[in-house]
Regions:
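Single conserved hydrophobic/aromatic residue that forms the stacking wall/gate
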Residues: 2, 184-191
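Short, glycine/charged-enriched hinge/interface segments at domain edges or termini
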Residues: 3-72, 90
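A generic structural signal for well-ordered coil/turn residues at beta-strand boundaries
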Residues: 19, 27-30, 125, 133-135, ...
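Residues in well-ordered beta-strands of folded domains
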Residues: 34, 140, 188
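Generic structural hydrophobic/aromatic packing signal, biased to beta-strands
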Residues: 51, 139, 163, 185-186
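Secondary-structure junction/capping motif
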Residues: 54, 111-112, 190
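Short glycine/threonine-rich loop/turn motifs
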Residues: 58, 66-180
Length: 191
């Protein structure tokens, strides 16, 4: 097993075969996810104005790729600012390492995540990047705690893009995995 590798079943087989009982590994992070918005639902049959809670399933599946512990915090409604603030205070003293929210991070009336996050002692804070899809994204670390918060956009494609380009590299860095380098290609139209 090499450094910066995620242990798989074949590694376990080799270690047990060789009689190796203890190896040094990184702690498995605990990730708590919240969806936000009055329009978000987990129901099968939905009215036209509702949106299926697809972001939680997407984030859960991506987090499970790392074998991290995923906890679904449920759906926070548009007026759940105080509920969210109380949950954050409680989380600060829990085993949760990373909080990820989906929605409520832009500049609208019900976009409460940035307002609540500002109330805490933060470092490495940003709230917007120049990419589309995915412009409204929040990242913060709580000073004195090993906890990070990502506020992703509510739009599923924007949320997936921000997860891929911001959360995913952060998770890799927690494990000590080197970031993937990308090849840049110029595309040409051919019709």
């Amino acid at each position: 097993v090499y450094k910066r590798q995620i242990l798989q079943s074949n590694h376990i087989l080799a270690l047990k075969t060789l009689g190796i009982k203890n190896i040094k590994v990184k702690k498995i992070p605990n990730i708590l996810f919240f969806s936000t918005g009055k329009e978000i639902t987990n129901q099968e049959n939905i009215p036209n104005w509702k949106v299926r809670n697809s972001n939680s399933y997407y984030i859960k599946s991506k987090v499970k790729n790392f074998l991290f512990n995923f906890f679904d915090g449920g759906i926070l409604r548009d007026r759940d600012e105080l509920v969210f603030e109380k949950k954050i205070k409680k989380i600060l003293h829990s085993k949760i390492d990373i909080i990820i929210t989906s929605g409520a991070v832009s500049a609208g009336k019900f976009d409460f995540v940035p307002r609540i996050i500002k109330k805490f002692n933060l470092s490495n804070h940003f709230k917007s990047v120049a990419i589309r899809p995915g412009k409204p994204i929040l990242f913060a670390k709580i000073k004195g705690k090993q906890k990070a918060i990502f506020g992703l956009p509510g739009n599923p494609i924007s949320s997936a893009a921000c997860f891929r380009f911001f959360v995913y590299p952060y998770l890799e860095s927690l494990l000590g995995i080197e970031a993937v380098s990308y090849t840049h290609l110029r595309a040409h139209e051919t019709y």
